[in-house]
Amino acid sequence: MDFSILKHLTGLAGVSGCEQDVRAYVKTLLAPHADRISTDVMGNLIVYKKGTSDKNLLLCAHLDEVGLMVNYVGNDGFLRFICVGGIDPRTLLAQRVRLQTKEGPVLGVIGTKPAHITTEADRAKAVGLKELFIDTGLPVEQVKRLIPVGTTAVLDRPYEEFGDGKITAKSLDNRAGVFVLAELVRALENPFYNVYAVFTTQEEVGLRGAVTAAYGIKADLALSLDTTGAADIPACSPQDYIIRLGEGVGITICDSYTIGNPQLVDALRAICEQNAIAYQLRVASRGGNDAGAVHLSKTGVRTCALSLPTRNIHSNVEIVSKHDLEMMFALALHVAQHEITF
């Protein structure tokens, strides 16, 4: 796998609803490998690769990332904001962001009342969004001209490899899934299924792109490629880990939005066991992904989510494992190349 592609993907800005830069890069990357490529009204990028059968496989990975949106520009030049997608405000304090303006990205820093003028009661409380602001360092007039209400901002942290095959970056949710799906399209040769590789939009705000994309494809089965929170850290007990970093691709049995098709789950487990693909079973009481929309399309689609273990999810220091990425790729590629019978 070419991890320079993942590095480039994580460096792009693509808050939900503003995925155009990510989509353009993926389209350029995959156009030479596609039999057909199109973009729909919702902004989903649909890459089609003809198979040797008349059966259709839908593979999806969402382009968007969590981020911020300016909802107030003060007369002092400081910006107030809301979160786009689920972000814990505790992770935002003292972080850098890049505001996406029509004249290019603008650096900002998230601040709050400084510690030396807060009370003991203030310091005992968790900082909420209303206590945070973005400081661009620019004159008020320039801020008001460049950064109107509705401007989005992404967390600002570079891709870095560290430790034993680990990667940390912002937006690994879900540029990691996009990377795996893009590498799959580049690797496919004479797949059994007609493969629809769909790079969806607005997953982080309600699986919206997947709803319309799935409706336009008569899929026989589907896989969603996405990240999931790995809680294998000192603050959590083993029963709450959900999934562990470095132990393989997650096959999702159940989450808040989807119960994985039992026959498909069994087939995926068998593929892993027969092909030395490391896997884990994921059962989560919270969270979901595009599978939640896809499996309800039309009269229903056999669907399962492949989940990539990710520490610090929805932050600017998300962590994934190269090993897990390789296992997700191997499983998804095998599914595309060979018929699954039920």
Residue ranges and their predicted role:
Residues 1-342:
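N-terminal hydrophobic/helix-forming segments and targeting peptides
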